[in-house]
Amino acid sequence: MNNKLVKLIALLGLSINVASAEAPEVNGNLGTKFSSDYHRRGQLVSQEAIQAQVGFNVGLGGVDVFGDFFTNQSTSSDGADNDELTVGLGNSFFEDKLSAYVGIYNTDNSESGDNLEAFASLGLDFPLSPTVSVYRDTDDSLYTFEGQVSYGVDLEIVNLELAGILGNTDVSSAVDSTYFGATLTATKTIKDNVDLYADVSLSDNDTRDNETLWGVGLSVKF
């Protein structure tokens, strides 16, 4: 983790302490998953990977403070390991119809190294739950723009969710890539706050043919 990221997280923690002396409402989640492949922004990171994730959300004086750590550990000889850390602040407006988020997103890849981005997102409490996000590399003027939608249905036996993503990312100052993804997830609650799920995804970008990915995982909320 680079020094810039450490300083930003420390500053965020200081602002949280100053902003509110109230007892915070804390929620968390963790999970693990086996995935046939891991794609990030339309690019293959690794095949056959074990993934783990832990996250938190703290409500302080009307502001949500959130963080998430995700790791992808390749089990194949030609794959890369990837660690991703997200920390940010969010708030809701217009009777929770509009949500806004800002934060930092750090990726550490075993082959390409460490990269830190700032991001801003807007989400709408409308059908399909549309969200738009923009990311900017803190060292170079490289941008990523993403739009996401999702739709869920409760079938009693399982919950189904279909999610789609469309984005464009600057690979370098001279090259960009447009990518698309769609994921269908089936989730079964096996105990209070414990879910078992399976998903299948389609991943595509403008430099290759589309690929199909799948995974199975377990998630816990607390």
Model-found features: residue ranges?
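Outer-membrane beta-barrel proteins
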Residues: 2-5, 13, 17-222
